[in-house]
Amino acid sequence: MTVLIGLGKAGCEIVNKFSDGYKKITIDAGSELPEFSSPEEYEQKLTNYSHLLDFDEQECYFFVCGAGKVSASSLRLLELIQTKKINLVYIYPEEIMLSPTQKKLNRVAFNVFQQYARSGLLNSMYIMSNEEICSFLPYYSIEDMYDHINEAIVNVFESVIFYLNEKPILGSHHEPKEISRIRTVEYGQLGDDKKNCYFPLDNVTETCYINIVNDEDMKNNRELLDLLKGIIKDNTEKNILSSFVVFKSDHQYSFYYAIRFTHYLQEK
């Protein structure tokens, strides 16, 4: 069973949106943790909270947004599960909506987590940008914006987690380089130039394409395989190590997820 950990308001709301079949752990100030007035207190005063992260599974996904004060407890909590394979999902907030203090917290957390990823303390760090996600949402209002953003994050991770553990009918799962731990995800329809990228990752060095092909295209689209191979060849010319897998589905449209990798630190 896949373990999902949500820290803070955003992390908890995202984890709670996942379907059944996951082990969900939510941690927030004022409930599982004390509520402190400063981020420094979360770093200094947290002790004896190992019971919150008591699970036998070896891999987990840890969802957190760095703009909240409670995010300062992340490093303490991650120390409790440092022997696990930790995939951190960082929710990058829209900075125009943040106070000066929140901006500082976000930038510090963003940089620290990237250093953790590069050092190997994290198995991976997926970056999700609220601003980028809003740019491709079909509609949202002030009241339900975050609800739609969270749904978009959940949808992509439920699919990616599922397909990474399934055997494809064509191709082989990507084996990224040891250093390629900073990541994001892209979504789009096959044959369509429009790309929905969850974060504008700079200096992409590797890409894994997960292609979900409907029955009609699987049987009758004689150009599709050339299209998929052509994308890999184009990436090779750009020095981007890439691979693809194909899964059959009963969806109306054929689409893909692309996991993009890099070892370069990101700035926002």
Model-derived regions: residue spans:
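Tubulin/FtsZ superfamily GTPase core signature
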Residues: 1-268
